[in-house]
A protein has these predicted regions:
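Catalytic alpha-helical scaffold of carbohydrate-active enzymes acting on polysaccharides/glycoconjugates
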Residues: 1-101
Length: 101
């Protein structure tokens, strides 16, 4: 039992933290440094996050009036600036997640 419980606002009993890692296709380039660019199927699947999922997540969180933290490698920031702008326009935080994961 906690002797000095944390006083959460509005009578809440706890808090939750939701974060997203946006690694995109940086994972392919780590696993296959010499020919990662040629693995079209895997790259296509991993590009779904920054191209489709990020706008949907940001819009859902806008509707719920929730802000969150996205952990993103610098490589992804360089390659997906539109996703980064979408996140920032939504008022969300971007946290460092290495350069290439």
């Amino acid at each position: 039992m906690i002797r000095n419980p944390i006083p959460w606002p509005n009578g809440a009993r706890c808090a939750a933290c939701v974060t997203f890692d946006m690694d995109a296709d940086s994972l392919i380039h780590i696993a296959y440094p010499d020919d990662g660019h040629s693995r079209v199927s895997a790259i296509s699947m991993l590009q779904y996050g920054p191209r489709v999922a990020i706008p949907r997540i940001v819009e859902t969180y806008r509707q719920l009036a929730i802000r969150q933290t996205f952990f993103i490698p610098a490589w992804c920031i360089e390659h997906y600036p539109e996703a980064i702008e979408t996140i920032l326009r939504g008022g969300h935080e971007i946290a460092h997640h290495g350069y290439l994961h």
